[in-house]
Amino acid sequence: MHYFPVFADLNNRPVLVVGGGGVAARKVNLLLKANADVRIVAQKLNAELTALFELGHILWIAGEFNSEQIRNVFLVIAATDDEYLNERVFRVAESQQKLVNVVDDQARCSFIFPSIIDRNPIQVAVSSGGTAPVLARLLREKLEALLPQHLGAMADISGKWRHKVKTKLKTVTERRRFWESLFNGRFSQLLKNRQTEAAKKELELQLDKDYRGGFVSLVGAGPGDAGLLTLKGLQEIQQADVVLYDALVSDEILELVRRDAKLVFVGKRAQGKQVAQENTNALLVKYAQQGKRVVRLKGGDPFVFGRGGEELEVLAERQIPFSVVPGITAAIGATAYAGIPLTHRDYAQSAVFVTGHRKANASDIEWQTLARSNQTLVIYMGTLKAKDIAERLQQFGRAGSTPIAVISQGTQARQKTHIGTLTALAEIAENAPTPALIVVGEVVTLHDKLAWFGEQKFAQKRPHFTLDSLRIESVA
């Protein structure tokens, strides 16, 4: 690290600016925001600086620069178009061990100005160390868009209440949970709407509550690629005390969980070791009743074949508060990464999602509906029943030549797309690693044209082998 980032307290501290033009004015305005005692050395001032002088905001030392002017100041800034004068200011400041900045001359700077995102009292500074100022500015612009304007008001009010909160809530965990809940709740929304007094009242009401009760967030982790986790989902897993996750949550996403959170595996896999749903429900209740902030992290979307509704029913019965963060379901993510659009005007006017893993006493499937042409059928957890699925679809009218895809480990680096026809579905599914998704419909023919994920697409190398009507393509 070439520059050490610090935030300097300039309140009422003397700062010397040498120069009276536009560049100097920009620096002066920045310094005044920090309540610095600004002194300007210049033969003359531009209109902006003249106005500040006449208002009494700055002290003007009219005349030439000399070394005595630096003696009792905290910072020195040289902002003239005279290279010789700037060099002299730098050397004098260095000799007196003063922090000095010569504008646009990094070699003559003992400190530099970062790009600033100001949400007073919250401040974010971005610097490239002078190597790429345009890049730093672009980064600042992105952060400006991300950080809400009311952050400063949130920090200001919470700072005034810190002592009361510390008195009321004795443990660090209680206080952390209180502030996290406050900043992510109605308090923040009121400040966003410029309802400051109502926000203060909300804080007071929340503090009077008993915050020992826990909370559960049901979060969809998406299909695997960590980049597809929603921003709100990321916020939830980084605030959690306990995360209960299933087998479909990728290691990439688990790496994003708060480091000191407890990770509890509650996964289910067909023909594998499973955690019973009743045990998962019991754990959710147990941790919430211990006053913990619990995240139930599910692959894909928790309300699409994820039994999320069943888990929330248990929480509702016990009056445990909860929230839901949707995720990108596997049918959306995996097909997109495989270059298979779910709908297309030429091939499919609808898409149907079904599960191949049904409750033992479930009513029979409407195969006639699933076998319709001009639609895309996506089957979750269907590889073990692929033979029966293929037979039933053909029995109810789907042609054996209908294109199909089996997408394994969708959206992840290990993704494999297995292409074939309905007659070969059982054979294809048997050779496909799980978890896998079955796609049935003419849209699969677009895969060759639209596949984009994986290095081999761009290298024009598509390793494959043929097994009757089976083709396997790997992105690994």
UniProtKB/Swiss-Prot annotation:
It catalyses: uroporphyrinogen III + 2 S-adenosyl-L-methionine = precorrin-2 + 2 S-adenosyl-L-homocysteine + H(+); precorrin-2 + NAD(+) = sirohydrochlorin + NADH + 2 H(+); siroheme + 2 H(+) = sirohydrochlorin + Fe(2+). Keywords: Cobalamin biosynthesis, Lyase, Methyltransferase, Multifunctional enzyme, NAD, Oxidoreductase, Phosphoprotein, Porphyrin biosynthesis, S-adenosyl-L-methionine, Transferase. One of its GO terms (molecular function) is uroporphyrin-III C-methyltransferase activity. InterPro entries: 4pyrrol_Mease, 4pyrrol_Methylase_sf, 4pyrrole_Mease_sub1, 4pyrrole_Mease_sub2, CobA/CysG_C, NAD(P)-bd_dom_sf, Siro_Cobalamin_biosynth, Sirohaem_synt_dimer_dom_sf. The gene is cysG. The modification Phosphoserine is found at residue 128. S-adenosyl-L-methionine binds at residues 223, 299-301, 304, 329-330, 381, 410. PROSITE patterns: SUMT_1, SUMT_2. SUPFAM superfamilies: NAD(P)-binding Rossmann-fold domains (SSF51735), Siroheme synthase middle domains-like (SSF75615), Tetrapyrrole methylase (SSF53790). This is Siroheme synthase. PANTHER family: SIROHEME SYNTHASE (PTHR45790:SF1), SIROHEME SYNTHASE-RELATED (PTHR45790). It comes from the Bacteria. Residues 1-203 are annotated as: Precorrin-2 dehydrogenase /sirohydrochlorin ferrochelatase. It holds the Pfam family Sirohm_synth_M. In the N-terminal section; belongs to the precorrin-2 dehydrogenase / sirohydrochlorin ferrochelatase family. In the C-terminal section; belongs to the precorrin methyltransferase family. Residues 214-476 are annotated as: Uroporphyrinogen-III C-methyltransferase. Then it catalyzes the NAD-dependent ring dehydrogenation of precorrin-2 to yield sirohydrochlorin. Finally, it catalyzes the ferrochelation of sirohydrochlorin to yield siroheme. The active site is at 246 (proton acceptor), 268 (proton donor). GO terms for biological process: cobalamin biosynthetic process; methylation; siroheme biosynthetic process. NAD(+) binds at residues 22-23, 43-44. Pathway: Cofactor biosynthesis; adenosylcobalamin biosynthesis; precorrin-2 from uroporphyrinogen III: step 1/1; Cofactor biosynthesis; adenosylcobalamin biosynthesis; sirohydrochlorin from precorrin-2: step 1/1; Porphyrin-containing compound metabolism; siroheme biosynthesis; precorrin-2 from uroporphyrinogen III: step 1/1; Porphyrin-containing compound metabolism; siroheme biosynthesis; siroheme from sirohydrochlorin: step 1/1. Gene3D superfamilies: Cobalt-precorrin-4 Transmethylase, Domain 1, Methyltransferase, Cobalt-precorrin-4 Transmethylase, Domain 2, NAD(P)-binding Rossmann-like Domain, Sirohaem synthase, dimerisation domain, Siroheme synthase, domain 2.
